[in-house]
Amino acid sequence: MSATAAPAATRPVISAWSAVSPYGLGAQALVDGLSSGRSTVAPVDGARWGVPEVPAHLVPGFETRQVLGKKGTRSMDRVTGLAVSVVGGLLDQPEADRERETGERAALVLGTTTGSAESMMDFTRTSLRGEAPFDVDPAVMPNAVMNCAAGQCSIWYGIRGPNTTLAQGRTAGLAALHYSTRLLSSGRAGSVLCTAAEEFSRARYWLERHSRAAEAGDDAEMALGEGAAVLLLQRPDTLSPARPALAEVLAVRTRVATGDRTRPVLEACVASALEAAGARPGDVWAASPSDAPGRLGERERQALTALFGTETVERVPGVGRLGDVSAASSTFQIAFLLATAALSDEAAGRLAVVTSADRDGSLACAVLRLVAP
């Protein structure tokens, strides 16, 4: 599949979105939460999660079996439950066309960090503690595989086209967006559910706590968050009146850099994406950084502010209000952008830039053209 930019007439468009977030279930809960500006942070139940009573941004009251029902969810882990729930939220919208959005011509792409670290560690632990290494619960084995969540989404809703999991940390959402556009432009799918999910768990808490301690300048710890977001991508010629275009994906570009090189390389990445989109910095109405913890997030925000100005960078609420949602960050950023643009008379036809930066060095930038609601 060529990464060459598609002609304007065939550039993929985003026609719908949904979310399961610390604001609640569904797109409207996110819109209402952003409008209210309310905080989603609260101390976690230490006994329930096996962690200190630290602040975190959890999806309120989310229990997989209560949300999805008891059938087929006995051994489903949290990240899979979040992913299946968010896809269902989009497919259950009144405007949805199940015939087009599921089936053999529908694809699903999911961005993640590692899948479920909790499931991987639990499965390994039982193997080490059992009388024999194979004394494990076979029902738990699928959860320990990174592509479990994506596979369950497709099985649950009958999505029989390409099914892909991309593990890329904080930039996974934009990697999934890029991959989704290539599936459409190559004709391998008629629609794509572009998804990203991140869970809160004991394993993730301790991994983040110990790994962040080694990062210079990251003394101010960001509370962990969780959730999932999904975008429906289609070719313009397959749109229906019920699902009009919300945004056109003009370009996605990536780079790699760490430390002091992050800011200049990110600026080069943004410049490359704008060039591919045939745009200039002055054309950009909103720019959304991924609010990475510590110095990395500071460098990312400084780069966008230098390119576009403070007003442009602050036009869309920061994804950091959901805490550190890691792999789900950039998909939530796009959801925030679409929610904000829908309430603005000046957004239609304007450009938006979404960037993401991961501490392992991956950088990404997407350029979108907003469409009037």
Describe the predicted segments one by one.
Residues 2-9, 93-111, 123-138, 159-162, ...:
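Structural signature of cysteine-dependent C-C bond-forming condensing enzymes
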Residues 10-16, 20, 28-45, 208-286, ...:
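Condensing-enzyme catalytic core mediating Claisen C-C bond formation in acyl metabolism
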Residues 13-14, 35-152, 156-157, 161, ...:
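Conserved beta-ketoacyl condensing-enzyme motif
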Residues 112-115, 169-172, 197-201, 252-256, ...:
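Acidic, glycine-rich active-site loops and adjacent beta-strand->loop/helix elements
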Residues 118, 198-218, 256-268, 292-306, ...:
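Active-site-adjacent elements of ketosynthase-type condensing enzymes
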